[in-house]
Design a protein with these regions (language model features):
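Short, flexible, glycine/charge-rich loop motifs used to bind or transfer phosphoryl groups or to couple energy/partner
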Residues: 17-18, 66
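Hydrophobic pocket/interface hotspot
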Residues: 7, 19-20, 27, 46, ...
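A solvent-exposed, acidic/Ser-Thr-rich amphipathic alpha-helical stretch
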Residues: 25-68
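Alpha-helix boundary recognition
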Residues: 12, 20, 55-58
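Short, aromatic-enriched amphipathic alpha-helices that serve as compact interaction elements
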Residues: 1-15
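A beta-strand edge to alpha-helix "cap/lid" segment located at domain peripheries
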Residues: 52-110
Length: 110
């Protein structure tokens, strides 16, 4: 499986630990979709922060994705749900380490 396929699978299953383990220790997620949902953008730095952030979001049902579809080796489209507000989004793996861990991923409105 590619990094983007693993990302979609972890997000759909709300597997915050599995999601965090896809990232390098200094991995980064930049999520720009939230501005469309009248929330602050997410800029999450580091595997541990990614784990804690999504544990909170999934646990309190403040974030989920629906209808994930991998469109190529680095991108996937899905519906991002921010506490009941849905946005069509596209995630892009921008950079990976030599051992295949995600170093930088962005999520933008589609």
């Amino acid at each position: 499986m590619t990094a983007i396929e693993k990302y979609v699978e972890a997000m759909e299953n709300k597997d915050y630990a599995g999601l965090a383990n896809l990232f390098s220790p200094d991995g980064i997620i930049n999520d720009y979709c939230t501005s469309s949902a009248a929330q602050n953008e997410y800029h999450i730095y580091g595997r541990e922060a990614i784990n804690m952030f999504f544990r909170n979001k999934f646990g309190f049902r403040k974030y989920s994705i629906l209808d994930g579809e991998v469109v190529n080796s680095t991108q996937a489209e899905f519906i991002a749900n921010f506490g009941g507000y849905n946005i069509k989004a596209i995630a892009t793996v921008r950079e990976v380490t030599e051992d295949g861990l995600i170093k930088r991923l962005t999520v933008r409105p589609k």
